[in-house]
Each structure stands twice: as structure tokens, then as C-alpha cells.
């Protein structure tokens, strides 16, 4: 008979390691599993210690959060361990985050943290402790497939779904992971936390970029990659200089505010050129992309990636965490993988993830994904160039 974690055996005979960040989600996960009778062990990773960030609302895995996780563990009566992963986190997440921004990308550090730290190192530690599974407080689900392996599926609460950040999870990792909150809403989680008497029941949610003390990511990038703060030109699609900026790190594709340029029509950041330090801007129409070239593709669908793609695989893709999946085709071209967006997308930014799904809504299955290497517009976007010609600047400014 299978228990609530889809495992053979009684809960009391099943050890579960819970990744406890100190927030309400992971704390409720630990309390819920303990209440169901599992042998629960809590582990918190100390990922950074940046002074101001320790007490900042929305920080994660710093001093106050470690204290909160320990308090919850004592409340529910489970052993709790803190592992120092600052060095690993700095190398795998913070350094790569800064490098990505310096090369004109807009990275998603949570994906790298899950891939390199939580679902690799912590998973190994859980196995060493004799755990049957590692449970987390992510809003996502998994289900058993006919062959006994597991599929990653979206959370029941679409507004809280975190599947975008977990696309890089491997099949082996999925078999060992469990997500008890996948069928809950956030209000239900908080209510459950209150019923367990957890002090974190009303604690603020953590921020995506948890390691940025001031909330200004450019401070972190500027310290690690000073060249990203070097000034350069803001130009239109024809290369005409419209203004100056103080570092490409201050910009991302699709950005409209803070350009420091007055024009007859709104201008948007279309691309960043780190080699020339140019920020290319233009009309919204020029943001529309329909082809995306991917790197570091991870496949967790059926069969192998090459076999699944064949001459082309119809699917749905999400190019930013806040957007709904859109219809697309995945193709293998000259040894690389390319996504063709049927309706196109605005603001497709290199460094972001393009995540694959088998359906546009509901508890769709996650098929994998990759990081956006580059994007191309429809037919060179001649119409957008025409619109750009009409946007004669009224004054040039400096982006600070």
C-alpha cells in the first residue's frame, strides 16, 4: 500500500528530509509531514550573510530565516541541521548571476540555485541521512507514470505555480523529490500553518533575488563585474545615437522606463550589446519575436529529446515566469534547438528560461526547457524599422 508520498511503507518507517528555508511554505511542509507520522528531518542551507539582508523582509536563507526554521523545528519536534553552503552558493549562483548580467543577459538565479544547490547537493545529503525522499515547499506537483518514474506538473494554483523555476530538474532528481503543497493555495497553506501554531504563518514571502542586500542587483553586479558599469551609447535600430547610459547592467529587454530619452512615441530596450556597450532601443513592434535559440536544454518528457522532437514537436512554452504558456514548435536545427512561437512574444530576453509544457493551462506536465541564447523577429521587422524612423528624439538624456 502506498502512503501519502506515493511510497511503499508506513509513514513512521519513512524518513523524509525537508528543505526548510525559514518561510511559511517549507515550514508548513515539515509540520504537515510530521503530523502525518513521517520521520522528518529539517535541513536549512546558509547561503549568504550580507549584513543588511539578514533583517530585510523578503530575504531568504540568511540569519533571521535560519532562526525561524530552527524555531519551527523545535515547535513540531523534529531534528534540524544548518549546512554552510555560502562558498558553493557564491560560486554557482552569485558569480554566474553577475557574469550573465555583464554579458547582456537577464538571468534567473532561482533556477541555478535549484539546479546546483538544492536539487544536487542537498539531495545527496538527504540520501546520506537515509531519507526516502526530499520534500520542499514549492508550489508544483509530481505524479507517477506507468513505468514508475515521475512527471513534473504545474501546481493547482496557477497564480502560485513555480514550475518555471524547476525545469532543469532531472528525471533522477524527480524520482526522489516530493512537493506536498502542490494541490494547495497560498491562503490554505497559511491557514494550515496557523493550525499548527507556526510563528511564520504570516511571514512575508521571499524575493526571487534573495542575496541582494539593498534590492538593487546592479550593486552586486557592479562589485563583481565592474565592466558592466562602463558608460555607452543608447542607439536606435539604425545605429543613431539617442543618448548615453552608465552601464548595460541597468537595462533589460522590454524595459521602457528610465531610458532618459524623450521621443514622440514610447521606446523600449530591444537588445544589449556588451561588446560595444550599446543599448539598442525602438518601438514596441520591434520587441515581437517568433524564433528563440536555446542553450543547455533539459528534457524530462517521454523518450529521449531527439526522439521526441523528430521533425518538430508541438508544445506550449513560457518565456517568463509571469506569463502563461503559449503555443510553439520545438525543432532541432544544425545541432541546436530552436523554438518557433506561433503567435510571437514581446520582450524575449537572453538569459531567461524557455520552459516546455504539454498544455496551456491546468496541471500541465513540464517537458523540460532551456535558457534563451538569442531571439529573432518576424521577417527582420521592417514595419518596426519604419516606426522607429518616426520616433525622432526631442532630447537626449543619461541613464544612471
From Swiss-Prot:
Keyword Disulfide bond: yes
Annotated site residue numbers, Interaction with tRNA: 138, 352
Stored CDD domains: MnmA_TRMU-like (cd01998)
Gene3D superfamilies the UniProt entry points to: Adenine nucleotide alpha hydrolases-like domains (2.30.30.280), HUPs (3.40.50.620), Translation factors (2.40.30.10)
Disulfide bonds, paired cysteine numbers: 113-210
Subcellular localization: Cytoplasm
GO biological process: tRNA wobble position uridine thiolation
Entry's Gene Ontology molecular function annotations: ATP binding; tRNA binding; tRNA-uridine 2-sulfurtransferase activity
Enzyme Commission number: 2.8.1.13
Protein origin, superkingdom: Bacteria
This protein's name: tRNA-specific 2-thiouridylase MnmA
Organism: Rhodopseudomonas palustris (strain BisA53)
